[in-house]
From Swiss-Prot:
Name of one Pfam family that matches: Glyco_hydro_32N
Name the UniProt record assigns to this protein: Beta-fructofuranosidase, insoluble isoenzyme 2
UniProt enzyme class: hydrolase
Family: Belongs to the glycosyl hydrolase 32 family.
Catalysis: reaction(s): Hydrolysis of terminal non-reducing beta-D-fructofuranoside residues in beta-D-fructofuranosides
EC number(s) reported in the record: 3.2.1.26
One GO cellular component term noted in the UniProt record for this chain: apoplast
InterPro entries hit by this protein: ConA-like_dom_sf, Fructan_Metab_Enzymes, Glyco_hydro_32, Glyco_hydro_32_AS, Glyco_hydro_32_C, Glyco_hydro_32_N, Glyco_hydro_beta-prop_sf
Keyword terms, alphabetized: Apoplast, Cell wall, Glycoprotein, Glycosidase, Hydrolase, Secreted, Signal
Length: 598
C-alpha cells in the first residue's frame, strides 16, 4: 500500500470509528415486539437451533433484526452509501424503514440513523424499495414506493431529497409536500405497482424511470414515466417491456459496454452521448415475485420508441439469472470512483421464522459484485469486488497439480475454512465418459441437479468442493460441476453441456432447514478440459462463482457439526474421469474492522 496509502487508510478508519460512536443507537431493538413476533410465529418458541457462530463474519449485516432489499446504492463525495429495507423492531418482516449505512471501501460499514421512515400520508403504511438518481448538479434524489392505505397495499411513488447536499454522509432526508409524485392511474393495478428505478436523462432533457407492475393475471410490466423536474411525471403510451412471467419487482435498467471493456457505464451518459450509445447494450433485470429469483435479458434500447427489445427473443422464457441460489431484489449502481457497475443482492435465511426470532437476526446482503458484459454479448459476468481481497489472510494454502481419482476426496489442510476464500482451477482428463444429457432436462438445471446431486456417480463429474464439512462427512455442502454430452437433436454434435450445482442437502443434521439444490448451466466451452471455481465461505453462506463469473450460486446453510474450527474443506471427484487440480489457493478471511456496530 505504501506510506501514503497507509496514512489515508488510517485517516478514514478513524473517521469511521468516530461515526460509529455517533451512530451507536441507530439500530434499536424493541424486545416487546420481538416477543409478540415470536408468539405469532410459534407457540412457545425454543432457543434457535442455529448456532450463534453461524452469524456471518464478512457479509453485510446489521447487528440485529430483519433486513431485505438493498435500496439506492450510490457513491457520493467519497463515500459509498447503502440503504436497505429494515425492521427496527424484530427479526421478521414488518415496520419497514430505510436503514442507512456508509463506507469508504464497501467492506467496513457504519450504520447511521434510518434515512426514510413512514411520516407522511403518502407512505404512512409503508416505505418500500426504490432507487437513487444523480441529478445534473451531482445531488442525489431518491424515488421510493409508499403505501398510503391501511386496508390494502395501495402503492404510490414518492421522492425524497437530502436536507444538506454538502453533507457527504447524507444523514438527513426530507419529503417534499407534493408527494406522491406518481400514482397508479389508467387501469394500473394499485397493489402491484412498485420499486422505481434509477432515472436516466435523454437528449430531450426529460428524465425517465421504470416502475414494476403486473398487468392482468400474469404479465410482468415495466412502465416508463417521464419528467423534466422530478415532480410532474407522465406515463409513456407503452411499457418499456413486458412478459408473461408474473409480477416484476425491483426492476433495474442500465447500459453495459459492448466493446470488450470491463468498465461500467453511467446510466444517463450512455443516452445523452450518441457516440457512447453506439458502443453499449442494455440490461433489463426483474425480480419475479412468484418465483423469488432475479432474471435479466441483454438487448437494445430504442430511445425514440421508448421500447426495449431483448437480443434473444426467448430471453424472457429462458431466464438467465444473476444467481441461481438465494439471491433476490438486486440493485446495481455506477461507481464513478472506479468506473465500474456494482451489483447488490439480498440473501434471506433458510431456517425457520421461529429460529430467526430466537436468534434475533435475519437476512444479509451478498458480497458486492462487479458486473460487465461477456465478450460474447449474450450474458453478464460477475466477480466479487476487488476490495474483498483485503480481508484475505497473509499466508494462503496452495495445492498444485494434484490428480483426484474417481471416487476420491482430498482434504485441504493448513487453514480454518469456516470463513475462507477458495479459488481453484480444474482440468478434466477426458470428456469421453460424459453422460448424454436427458432432453427433458435440457432447460431445467434445477431439476437435473436435484436428480443428479453430488453423491450421484457420473461420467465427467460431479467434481468440485465440499465446504463446511464435518470430519466424518456427516455434514457437507457440495459445490460442483458435471459435464454432459448435448441432448441428441438430429444426430448433430454440439459442445459439451456444463452444469454447476450447489447441493446443501447434507449441510446440516438439524431438522426443519430449507435445503434445496441450486443449479444453472454454464455457457462455457470446456472442450479444452479447463474450468474454474471460486467460493466465498462465510460460516452460514457459500457464495460461488463458476467459470470466471458466468454462473453464480449463493446458498445459506446451518451446520451443527462443521462450525468454526470443526469445519473442513475437501476437493472431491465422484465421476469416472480423473480430475486434476491445476491450482487451488485458499485464504482464511478476516472480519472487517466495522460492520454496522456488530
Amino acid at each position: 500500500m505504501g506510506v501514503l496509502g497507509s496514512r489515508v487508510a488510517w485517516a478514514w478508519l478513524v473517521q469511521l470509528l468516530l461515526l460509529q460512536q455517533l451512530a451507536g443507537a441507530s439500530h434499536v431493538v424493541y424486545d416487546d415486539l420481538e416477543l409478540q413476533a415470536a408468539a405469532a410465529t410459534a407457540d412457545g418458541v425454543p432457543p434457535s437451533i442455529v448456532d450463534s457462530e453461524l452469524r456471518t463474519g464478512y457479509h453485510f449485516q446489521p447487528p440485529k433484526n430483519w433486513i431485505n432489499d438493498p435500496n439506492a446504492p450510490m457513491y457520493y463525495k467519497g463515500w459509498y452509501h447503502l440503504f436497505y429495507q429494515y425492521n427496527p423492531k424484530g427479526a421478521v418482516w414488518g415496520n419497514i424503514v430505510w436503514a442507512h449505512s456508509v463506507s469508504r471501501d464497501l467492506i467496513n460499514w457504519v450504520a447511521l440513523k434510518p434515512a426514510i421512515e413512514p411520516s407522511i400520508r403518502a407512505d404512512k403504511y409503508g416505505c418500500w424499495s426504490g432507487s437513487a438518481t444523480m441529478m445534473a448538479d451531482g445531488t442525489p434524489v431518491i424515488m421510493y414506493t409508499g403505501v398510503n392505505r391501511p386496508d390494502v397495499n395501495y402503492q404510490v411513488q414518492n421522492v425524497a431529497l437530502p436536507r444538506n447536499g454538502s453533507d457527504p454522509l447524507l444523514r438527513e432526508w426530507v419529503k417534499p409536500g407534493h408527494n406522491p409524485v406518481i400514482v397508479p392511474e389508467g387501469g394500473i393495478n394499485a397493489t402491484q405497482f412498485r420499486d422505481p428505478t434509477t432515472a436516466w436523462r435523454g437528449a430531450d432533457g426529460h428524465w425517465r424511470l421504470l416502475v414494476g407492475s403486473l398487468a392482468g393475471q400474469s404479465r410482468g410490466v415495466a412502465y416508463v414515466y417521464r419528467s423534466r423536474d422530478f415532480r410532474r411525471w407522465t406515463r409513456a403510451a407503452q411499457p418499456l417491456h413486458s412478459a408473461p412471467t408474473g409480477m416484476w419487482e425491483c426492476p433495474d435498467f442500465y447500459p453495459v459496454t459492448a466493446d470488450g471493456r470491463r468498465e461500467g457505464v453511467d446510466t444517463s451518459s450512455a443516452v445523452v452521448d450518441a457516440a457512447a450509445s453506439a458502443r453499449v447494450k442494455y440490461v433489463l433485470k426483474n425480480s419475479l415475485d412468484l418465483r423469488r429469483y432475479d432474471y435479466y435479458t441483454v438487448g437494445t434500447y430504442d430511445r425514440k420508441a421508448e421500447r426495449y427489445v431483448p437480443d434473444d427473443p426467448a430471453g424472457d422464457e429462458h431466464h438467465i439469472r444473476y444467481d441461481y441460489g438465494n439471491f433476490y431484489a438486486s440493485k446495481t449502481f455506477y461507481d464513478p470512483a472506479k468506473r465500474r457497475r456494482i451489483l447488490w443482492g439480498w440473501a434471506n435465511e433458510s431456517d425457520t421464522a421461529a429460529d430467526d426470532v430466537a436468534k434475533g437476526w435475519a437476512g444479509i446482503q451478498a458480497i458486492p459484485r462487479k458486473v460487465w458484459l461477456d465478450p460474447s454479448g449474450k450474458q453478464l459476468l460477475q466477480w466479487p469486488i476487488e476490495e474483498v481481497e483485503r480481508l484475505r489472510g497473509k499466508w494462503p494454502v496452495i495445492l498444485k497439480d494434484r490428480v483426484v481419482k474417481p471416487g476420491e476426496h482430498v482434504e485441504v489442510t493448513g487453514l480454518q475454512t469456516a470463513q475462507a476464500d477458495v479459488e481453484v482451477s480444474f482440468e478434466v482428463g477426458s470428456l469421453e465418459a460424459a453422460e448424454r444429457l436427458d432432453p427433458a432436462m435440457a432447460y431445467d438445471a434445477q431439476r437435473l441437479c436435484s436428480a443428479r446431486g453430488a453423491d450421484a456417480r457420473g461420467g465427467v463429474g460431479p467434481f468440485g468442493l465440499w465446504v463446511l464439512a464435518s470430519a466424518g462427512l456427516e455434514e457437507k455442502t457440495a459445490v460442483f460441476f458435471r459435464v454432459f454430452r448435448p441432448a441428441a437433436r438430429g444426430g448433430g454434435a454440439g459442445k459439451p453441456v456444463v452444469l454447476m450445482c450447489t447441493d446443501p442437502t447434507k449441510s446440516s443434521r438439524n431438522p426443519n432447514m430449507y435445503q434445496p439444490t441450486f443449479a444453472g448451466f454454464v455457457d462455457t466451452d470446456i472442450t479444452n478440459g479447463k474450468i474454474s471455481l471460486r467460493s466465498l465461505i462465510d460460516r452460514s453462506v457459500v457464495e460461488s462463482f463458476g467459470a470466471g463469473g458466468k454462473a453464480c450460486i449463493l446458498s445459506r446453510v446451518y451446520p451443527s457439526l462443521a462450525i468454526g474450527k470443526n469445519a473442513r474443506l475437501y476437493v472431491f471427484n465422484n465421476g469416472k474421469a480423473e480430475i486434476k487440480v491445476s491450482q487451488l489457493t485458499a485464504w482464511e478471511m478476516k472480519k472487517p474492522v466495522m460492520m454496522n456496530g456488530a
